[in-house]
Protein backbone atom coordinates (compact mmCIF):
# COMPACT_ATOMS: atom_id res chain seq x y z
CA UNK A 1 0.00 0.00 0.00
CA UNK A 2 1.65 3.25 -1.10
CA UNK A 3 1.61 6.20 1.26
CA UNK A 4 1.05 9.26 -0.92
CA UNK A 5 0.30 11.89 1.75
CA UNK A 6 2.19 15.15 1.31
CA UNK A 7 5.06 15.64 3.79
CA UNK A 8 4.34 17.87 6.77
CA UNK A 9 6.61 19.71 9.18
CA UNK A 10 7.82 17.45 11.96
CA UNK A 11 6.05 18.07 15.24
CA UNK A 12 8.98 19.20 17.32
CA UNK A 13 6.73 21.82 18.83
CA UNK A 14 3.02 22.20 18.79
CA UNK A 15 3.18 25.26 16.61
CA UNK A 16 4.94 23.49 13.82
CA UNK A 17 1.90 21.47 12.77
CA UNK A 18 -0.94 23.87 13.41
CA UNK A 19 -1.49 24.73 9.73
CA UNK A 20 -0.65 21.33 8.29
CA UNK A 21 -3.25 19.05 6.78
CA UNK A 22 -4.21 15.95 8.76
CA UNK A 23 -2.85 12.89 6.92
CA UNK A 24 -5.66 10.40 7.44
CA UNK A 25 -4.00 7.83 5.16
CA UNK A 26 -0.95 7.72 7.43
CA UNK A 27 -3.12 7.70 10.55
CA UNK A 28 -5.13 4.81 9.13
CA UNK A 29 -1.98 2.87 8.30
CA UNK A 30 -0.39 3.39 11.71
CA UNK A 31 -3.70 2.46 13.36
CA UNK A 32 -3.83 -0.75 11.30
CA UNK A 33 -0.26 -1.52 12.36
CA UNK A 34 -1.25 -0.90 15.97
CA UNK A 35 -4.19 -3.28 15.52
CA UNK A 36 -1.91 -6.04 14.23
CA UNK A 37 0.75 -5.41 16.89
CA UNK A 38 -1.66 -5.46 19.83
CA UNK A 39 -3.66 -8.38 18.41
CA UNK A 40 -0.45 -10.42 18.47
CA UNK A 41 0.34 -9.26 22.00
CA UNK A 42 -3.13 -10.13 23.28
CA UNK A 43 -2.76 -13.71 22.07
CA UNK A 44 -0.40 -14.35 24.97
CA UNK A 45 -3.06 -13.25 27.46
CA UNK A 46 -5.82 -15.09 25.61
CA UNK A 47 -4.08 -18.49 25.72
CA UNK A 48 -3.27 -18.37 29.45
CA UNK A 49 -5.73 -21.21 30.18
CA UNK A 50 -4.00 -23.37 27.55
CA UNK A 51 -0.56 -22.53 28.93
CA UNK A 52 -1.75 -23.24 32.47
CA UNK A 53 -3.03 -26.65 31.41
CA UNK A 54 0.00 -27.59 29.27
CA UNK A 55 2.69 -26.51 31.75
CA UNK A 56 0.73 -26.87 35.06
CA UNK A 57 1.23 -23.19 35.91
CA UNK A 58 0.21 -21.41 39.11
CA UNK A 59 -1.45 -17.98 39.00
CA UNK A 60 1.89 -16.52 40.10
CA UNK A 61 3.62 -18.08 37.07
CA UNK A 62 0.88 -16.73 34.80
CA UNK A 63 1.53 -13.31 36.31
CA UNK A 64 5.25 -13.81 35.61
CA UNK A 65 4.52 -14.24 31.89
CA UNK A 66 2.70 -10.90 31.86
CA UNK A 67 5.44 -9.30 33.97
CA UNK A 68 8.17 -10.53 31.60
CA UNK A 69 6.36 -9.13 28.56
CA UNK A 70 5.52 -5.83 30.22
CA UNK A 71 8.99 -5.27 31.69
CA UNK A 72 10.72 -6.04 28.38
CA UNK A 73 8.50 -3.39 26.86
CA UNK A 74 8.34 -0.83 29.67
CA UNK A 75 12.05 -0.63 30.48
CA UNK A 76 13.06 -0.06 26.86
CA UNK A 77 10.30 2.30 25.69
CA UNK A 78 11.52 5.52 27.39
CA UNK A 79 15.07 4.77 26.20
CA UNK A 80 13.89 4.23 22.62
CA UNK A 81 11.79 7.41 22.79
CA UNK A 82 14.62 9.53 24.23
CA UNK A 83 17.11 8.23 21.64
CA UNK A 84 14.82 8.75 18.66
CA UNK A 85 13.98 12.30 19.82
CA UNK A 86 17.66 13.03 19.23
CA UNK A 87 18.34 10.64 16.35
CA UNK A 88 15.20 9.82 14.33
CA UNK A 89 15.14 6.20 13.12
CA UNK A 90 12.23 5.77 10.67
CA UNK A 91 13.14 2.16 9.82
CA UNK A 92 13.04 1.06 13.45
CA UNK A 93 9.31 0.34 13.06
CA UNK A 94 9.55 -2.71 10.74
CA UNK A 95 12.73 -3.85 12.52
CA UNK A 96 10.89 -3.87 15.85
CA UNK A 97 8.10 -5.94 14.34
CA UNK A 98 10.69 -8.58 13.41
CA UNK A 99 11.28 -9.14 17.15
CA UNK A 100 7.54 -9.66 17.57
CA UNK A 101 7.49 -12.16 14.72
CA UNK A 102 10.33 -14.18 16.25
CA UNK A 103 8.51 -14.22 19.61
CA UNK A 104 5.39 -15.59 17.92
CA UNK A 105 7.33 -18.43 16.30
CA UNK A 106 9.00 -19.32 19.61
CA UNK A 107 5.65 -19.27 21.45
CA UNK A 108 4.14 -21.69 18.94
CA UNK A 109 7.08 -24.09 19.39
CA UNK A 110 7.70 -23.58 23.13
CA UNK A 111 8.14 -26.80 25.08
CA UNK A 112 8.87 -25.30 28.49
CA UNK A 113 7.84 -22.44 30.77
CA UNK A 114 11.24 -20.80 30.18
CA UNK A 115 10.68 -20.76 26.42
CA UNK A 116 7.28 -19.12 26.97
CA UNK A 117 8.96 -16.40 29.07
CA UNK A 118 11.57 -15.80 26.34
CA UNK A 119 8.82 -15.57 23.71
CA UNK A 120 7.00 -13.02 25.86
CA UNK A 121 10.23 -11.01 26.21
CA UNK A 122 10.76 -10.95 22.42
CA UNK A 123 7.20 -9.74 21.79
CA UNK A 124 7.71 -7.11 24.51
CA UNK A 125 10.92 -5.92 22.86
CA UNK A 126 9.10 -5.44 19.57
CA UNK A 127 6.45 -3.45 21.41
CA UNK A 128 9.09 -1.23 23.04
CA UNK A 129 10.18 -0.02 19.61
CA UNK A 130 6.72 0.17 18.07
CA UNK A 131 4.81 2.33 20.56
CA UNK A 132 6.97 5.47 21.01
CA UNK A 133 7.85 5.70 17.32
CA UNK A 134 4.33 5.04 16.04
CA UNK A 135 2.94 7.58 18.52
CA UNK A 136 5.40 10.10 17.06
CA UNK A 137 4.17 9.25 13.54
CA UNK A 138 0.57 9.83 14.69
CA UNK A 139 1.49 13.28 16.00
CA UNK A 140 3.44 14.12 12.84
CA UNK A 141 0.39 13.22 10.72
CA UNK A 142 -2.11 14.98 13.01
CA UNK A 143 -2.17 18.39 11.35
CA UNK A 144 -2.50 19.88 14.84
CA UNK A 145 -5.48 17.69 15.81
CA UNK A 146 -3.41 15.80 18.35
CA UNK A 147 -6.21 14.29 20.40
CA UNK A 148 -7.99 12.99 17.31
CA UNK A 149 -4.75 11.54 15.92
CA UNK A 150 -3.91 9.75 19.17
CA UNK A 151 -7.44 8.33 19.37
CA UNK A 152 -7.23 6.98 15.81
CA UNK A 153 -3.85 5.46 16.65
CA UNK A 154 -5.02 4.06 19.99
CA UNK A 155 -8.28 2.61 18.70
CA UNK A 156 -6.36 0.37 16.33
CA UNK A 157 -4.45 -1.09 19.25
CA UNK A 158 -7.55 -1.58 21.33
CA UNK A 159 -9.46 -3.27 18.51
CA UNK A 160 -6.44 -5.49 18.06
CA UNK A 161 -6.45 -6.35 21.75
CA UNK A 162 -10.13 -7.25 21.53
CA UNK A 163 -9.63 -9.37 18.40
CA UNK A 164 -6.87 -11.45 19.99
CA UNK A 165 -9.07 -13.39 22.44
CA UNK A 166 -11.80 -13.87 19.82
CA UNK A 167 -9.37 -15.29 17.27
CA UNK A 168 -7.67 -17.35 19.96
CA UNK A 169 -11.03 -18.90 20.85
CA UNK A 170 -11.62 -19.86 17.20
CA UNK A 171 -8.14 -20.67 15.90
CA UNK A 172 -6.02 -21.70 18.91
CA UNK A 173 -8.19 -23.01 21.77
CA UNK A 174 -9.78 -25.94 19.84
CA UNK A 175 -6.48 -27.10 18.28
CA UNK A 176 -3.68 -26.22 20.68
CA UNK A 177 -0.84 -23.76 21.14
CA UNK A 178 0.86 -24.71 17.86
CA UNK A 179 -1.78 -22.78 15.91
CA UNK A 180 -0.22 -19.56 17.22
CA UNK A 181 2.05 -19.94 14.16
CA UNK A 182 -0.82 -18.83 11.89
CA UNK A 183 -0.49 -15.33 13.34
CA UNK A 184 2.97 -15.01 11.78
CA UNK A 185 0.99 -13.87 8.71
CA UNK A 186 -0.31 -10.89 10.72
CA UNK A 187 3.25 -9.97 11.73
CA UNK A 188 4.40 -10.15 8.10
CA UNK A 189 1.53 -7.88 7.01
CA UNK A 190 2.47 -5.41 9.77
CA UNK A 191 6.09 -5.37 8.55
CA UNK A 192 4.93 -4.51 5.01
CA UNK A 193 2.66 -1.68 6.23
CA UNK A 194 5.32 -0.31 8.60
CA UNK A 195 7.88 -0.30 5.79
CA UNK A 196 5.58 2.00 3.79
CA UNK A 197 5.07 4.25 6.82
CA UNK A 198 8.85 4.38 7.32
CA UNK A 199 9.27 5.71 3.77
CA UNK A 200 6.83 8.53 4.58
CA UNK A 201 8.59 9.16 7.90
CA UNK A 202 11.96 9.33 6.09
CA UNK A 203 10.56 11.87 3.62
CA UNK A 204 9.36 13.98 6.55
CA UNK A 205 12.78 13.84 8.13
CA UNK A 206 14.60 14.76 4.90
CA UNK A 207 12.23 17.67 4.25
CA UNK A 208 12.85 19.17 7.68
CA UNK A 209 16.57 18.44 7.88
CA UNK A 210 18.54 21.67 8.00
CA UNK A 211 15.51 23.85 8.69
CA UNK A 212 15.68 26.02 11.82
CA UNK A 213 13.83 24.39 14.69
CA UNK A 214 10.87 26.11 16.28
CA UNK A 215 11.49 27.67 19.67
CA UNK A 216 10.05 25.38 22.33
CA UNK A 217 8.42 27.11 25.28
CA UNK A 218 7.23 25.07 28.23
CA UNK A 219 3.66 26.13 29.08
CA UNK A 220 4.08 25.74 32.87
CA UNK A 221 6.80 26.26 35.51
CA UNK A 222 9.03 23.24 36.14
CA UNK A 223 7.56 22.44 39.57
CA UNK A 224 4.02 22.36 38.16
CA UNK A 225 5.15 20.14 35.29
CA UNK A 226 6.76 17.70 37.75
CA UNK A 227 3.58 17.66 39.89
CA UNK A 228 1.33 17.15 36.86
CA UNK A 229 3.46 14.33 35.41
CA UNK A 230 3.57 12.63 38.84
CA UNK A 231 -0.22 12.76 39.11
CA UNK A 232 -0.61 11.42 35.58
CA UNK A 233 1.67 8.48 36.42
CA UNK A 234 -0.41 7.71 39.53
CA UNK A 235 -3.53 7.72 37.35
CA UNK A 236 -1.79 5.38 34.89
CA UNK A 237 -1.02 3.09 37.85
CA UNK A 238 -4.70 3.10 38.84
CA UNK A 239 -5.94 2.44 35.29
CA UNK A 240 -3.51 -0.29 34.33
CA UNK A 241 -3.53 -2.17 37.63
CA UNK A 242 -7.29 -2.43 37.21
CA UNK A 243 -6.97 -3.33 33.52
CA UNK A 244 -4.49 -6.09 34.48
CA UNK A 245 -7.12 -7.64 36.74
CA UNK A 246 -9.45 -7.97 33.74
CA UNK A 247 -7.01 -8.82 30.95
CA UNK A 248 -5.09 -11.46 32.94
CA UNK A 249 -7.71 -13.00 35.25
CA UNK A 250 -11.22 -12.20 34.00
CA UNK A 251 -11.52 -15.52 32.15
CA UNK A 252 -10.48 -17.43 35.29
CA UNK A 253 -12.93 -15.36 37.38
CA UNK A 254 -15.80 -16.25 35.05
CA UNK A 255 -14.79 -19.92 34.86
CA UNK A 256 -14.45 -20.31 38.64
CA UNK A 257 -17.37 -18.16 39.83
CA UNK A 258 -19.92 -18.92 37.11
CA UNK A 259 -18.64 -22.20 35.61
CA UNK A 260 -18.16 -20.90 32.06
CA UNK A 261 -16.11 -22.79 29.45
CA UNK A 262 -12.84 -21.35 28.16
CA UNK A 263 -14.47 -20.30 24.88
CA UNK A 264 -17.41 -18.54 26.58
CA UNK A 265 -15.11 -16.80 29.04
CA UNK A 266 -12.94 -15.58 26.15
CA UNK A 267 -16.04 -14.17 24.43
CA UNK A 268 -16.78 -12.15 27.58
CA UNK A 269 -13.18 -10.91 27.52
CA UNK A 270 -13.66 -9.95 23.86
CA UNK A 271 -16.76 -7.91 24.81
CA UNK A 272 -14.75 -6.03 27.44
CA UNK A 273 -11.85 -5.35 25.08
CA UNK A 274 -14.22 -4.28 22.29
CA UNK A 275 -15.75 -1.76 24.71
CA UNK A 276 -12.23 -0.54 25.49
CA UNK A 277 -11.62 -0.01 21.77
CA UNK A 278 -14.89 1.91 21.38
CA UNK A 279 -14.15 4.08 24.41
CA UNK A 280 -10.75 5.01 23.04
CA UNK A 281 -12.38 6.78 20.09
CA UNK A 282 -14.06 9.22 22.47
CA UNK A 283 -11.19 10.42 24.66
CA UNK A 284 -8.99 12.24 22.15
CA UNK A 285 -11.56 14.28 20.17
CA UNK A 286 -13.51 15.19 23.32
CA UNK A 287 -10.25 16.29 24.94
CA UNK A 288 -9.57 18.51 21.90
CA UNK A 289 -12.95 20.15 22.46
CA UNK A 290 -13.34 20.54 26.24
CA UNK A 291 -9.83 20.00 27.64
CA UNK A 292 -7.85 16.88 28.52
CA UNK A 293 -8.22 17.37 32.28
CA UNK A 294 -11.97 16.87 32.25
CA UNK A 295 -11.76 13.73 30.13
CA UNK A 296 -9.14 12.31 32.51
CA UNK A 297 -11.32 13.17 35.51
CA UNK A 298 -14.43 11.53 34.11
CA UNK A 299 -12.74 8.43 32.72
CA UNK A 300 -10.82 7.42 35.87
CA UNK A 301 -13.13 8.50 38.69
CA UNK A 302 -16.25 7.86 36.60
CA UNK A 303 -15.82 4.07 36.66
CA UNK A 304 -15.62 3.83 40.47
CA UNK A 305 -19.34 3.12 41.07
CA UNK A 306 -19.25 0.27 38.56
CA UNK A 307 -16.01 -1.30 39.82
CA UNK A 308 -17.34 -1.24 43.39
CA UNK A 309 -20.51 -3.11 42.34
CA UNK A 310 -18.81 -5.65 40.03
CA UNK A 311 -17.59 -8.23 42.62
CA UNK A 312 -21.16 -8.72 43.87
CA UNK A 313 -22.94 -8.91 40.49
CA UNK A 314 -24.58 -11.88 38.75
CA UNK A 315 -23.17 -13.28 35.50
CA UNK A 316 -25.46 -11.09 33.39
CA UNK A 317 -24.61 -7.91 35.27
CA UNK A 318 -20.92 -8.83 35.41
CA UNK A 319 -20.90 -8.79 31.60
CA UNK A 320 -22.79 -5.48 31.47
CA UNK A 321 -20.64 -3.79 34.11
CA UNK A 322 -17.33 -4.83 32.57
CA UNK A 323 -18.41 -3.42 29.20
CA UNK A 324 -19.33 -0.10 30.87
CA UNK A 325 -16.05 -0.06 32.81
CA UNK A 326 -14.02 -0.78 29.69
CA UNK A 327 -15.76 1.93 27.65
CA UNK A 328 -15.34 4.68 30.26
CA UNK A 329 -11.85 3.76 31.45
CA UNK A 330 -10.45 3.53 27.92
CA UNK A 331 -11.07 7.19 27.14
CA UNK A 332 -8.33 8.17 29.61
CA UNK A 333 -5.10 7.17 27.90
CA UNK A 334 -5.25 9.30 24.75
CA UNK A 335 -6.13 12.33 26.88
CA UNK A 336 -3.35 11.57 29.39
CA UNK A 337 -0.74 11.09 26.66
CA UNK A 338 -1.56 14.27 24.73
CA UNK A 339 -1.81 16.22 28.02
CA UNK A 340 1.71 15.03 28.92
CA UNK A 341 3.05 15.84 25.43
CA UNK A 342 1.71 19.38 25.83
CA UNK A 343 3.44 19.66 29.22
CA UNK A 344 6.79 18.69 27.64
CA UNK A 345 6.79 19.98 24.04
CA UNK A 346 9.70 18.82 21.90
CA UNK A 347 10.03 15.52 23.77
CA UNK A 348 7.35 13.54 21.98
CA UNK A 349 9.27 10.26 21.82
CA UNK A 350 10.45 10.38 25.42
CA UNK A 351 6.99 11.25 26.75
CA UNK A 352 5.33 8.56 24.63
CA UNK A 353 7.93 6.00 25.68
CA UNK A 354 7.64 6.96 29.34
CA UNK A 355 3.86 6.73 29.46
CA UNK A 356 3.51 3.64 27.26
CA UNK A 357 6.36 2.02 29.17
CA UNK A 358 4.95 2.91 32.58
CA UNK A 359 1.51 1.72 31.52
CA UNK A 360 2.93 -1.60 30.36
CA UNK A 361 5.07 -1.90 33.49
CA UNK A 362 2.10 -1.28 35.77
CA UNK A 363 0.10 -3.83 33.81
CA UNK A 364 2.84 -6.40 34.28
CA UNK A 365 3.43 -5.62 37.94
CA UNK A 366 -0.32 -5.67 38.52
CA UNK A 367 -0.64 -9.08 36.89
CA UNK A 368 2.14 -10.53 39.08
CA UNK A 369 0.90 -8.99 42.34
CA UNK A 370 -2.73 -9.88 41.67
CA UNK A 371 -1.72 -13.41 40.68
CA UNK A 372 0.08 -13.80 44.02
CA UNK A 373 -3.03 -12.57 45.85
CA UNK A 374 -5.23 -14.97 43.87
CA UNK A 375 -2.93 -17.92 44.68
CA UNK A 376 -3.03 -17.21 48.43
CA UNK A 377 -6.67 -16.11 48.75
CA UNK A 378 -9.17 -16.22 45.88
CA UNK A 379 -9.69 -14.70 42.46
CA UNK A 380 -12.83 -12.96 43.78
CA UNK A 381 -10.82 -11.06 46.40
CA UNK A 382 -8.69 -9.61 43.61
CA UNK A 383 -11.72 -7.80 42.19
CA UNK A 384 -12.85 -6.62 45.62
CA UNK A 385 -9.45 -5.00 46.17
CA UNK A 386 -9.13 -3.53 42.68
CA UNK A 387 -12.60 -1.99 42.95
CA UNK A 388 -11.13 0.93 44.95
CA UNK A 389 -8.34 1.84 42.50
CA UNK A 390 -10.41 4.27 40.36
CA UNK A 391 -10.94 6.45 43.44
CA UNK A 392 -7.39 7.71 42.82
CA UNK A 393 -9.02 9.70 40.02
CA UNK A 394 -9.79 12.35 42.64
CA UNK A 395 -6.15 13.48 42.27
CA UNK A 396 -7.14 14.99 38.91
CA UNK A 397 -8.33 18.05 40.82
CA UNK A 398 -4.66 19.02 41.27
CA UNK A 399 -3.86 18.96 37.54
CA UNK A 400 -3.47 22.41 35.94
CA UNK A 401 -5.96 23.24 33.20
CA UNK A 402 -3.70 23.53 30.15
CA UNK A 403 -6.42 24.01 27.54
CA UNK A 404 -5.32 26.03 24.55
CA UNK A 405 -6.39 26.63 20.99
CA UNK A 406 -4.17 24.84 18.48
UniProtKB/Swiss-Prot annotation:
Residue ranges that the Swiss-Prot or TrEMBL entry lists as coiled coil: none
List the stretches on the Cytoplasmic face of the membrane. Answer: 124-151, 199-225, 288-294, 341-353, 400-406
Query: Pfam families, alphabetically?
Result: MFS_1
Q: How does this protein lie in the membrane?
A: Multi-pass membrane protein
Grouped into one coarse class, the protein's main location is membrane
Q: Where in the cell is it found?
A: Cell inner membrane
- Could you list the residue ranges that cross the membrane? 43-63, 64-84, 103-123, 152-172, 178-198, 226-246, 267-287, 295-315, 320-340, 354-374, 379-399
Superkingdom per UniProt: Bacteria
Q: Which residues lie on this side of the membrane: Periplasmic?
A: 1-42, 85-102, 173-177, 247-266, 316-319, 375-378
Q: Could you state a single Gene Ontology molecular function term?
A: transmembrane transporter activity
Its BP terms in the Gene Ontology are: DNA damage response; response to antibiotic
Q: InterPro entries from the xrefs?
A: MFS (IPR011701), MFS_dom (IPR020846), MFS_trans_sf (IPR036259)
Which keywords annotate this record? Antibiotic resistance, Cell inner membrane, Cell membrane, Membrane, Transmembrane, Transmembrane helix
What the record says about family reads: Belongs to the major facilitator superfamily.
Functionally, this protein is described as follows: Confers the resistance against fosmidomycin.
Q: What is the protein's name according to its record? A: Fosmidomycin resistance protein
What is the organism field in this record?
A: Escherichia coli (strain K12)
Amino acid sequence: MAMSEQPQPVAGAAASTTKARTSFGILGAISLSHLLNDMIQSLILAIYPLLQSEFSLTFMQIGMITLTFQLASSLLQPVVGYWTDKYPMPWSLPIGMCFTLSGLVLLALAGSFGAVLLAAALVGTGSSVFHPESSRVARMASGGRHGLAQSIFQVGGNFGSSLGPLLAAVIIAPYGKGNVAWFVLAALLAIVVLAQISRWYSAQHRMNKGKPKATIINPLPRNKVVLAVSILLILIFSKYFYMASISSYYTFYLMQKFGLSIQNAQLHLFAFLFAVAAGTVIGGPVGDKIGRKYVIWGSILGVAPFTLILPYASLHWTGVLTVIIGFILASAFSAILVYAQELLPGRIGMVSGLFFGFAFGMGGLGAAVLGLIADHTSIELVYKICAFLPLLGMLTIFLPDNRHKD
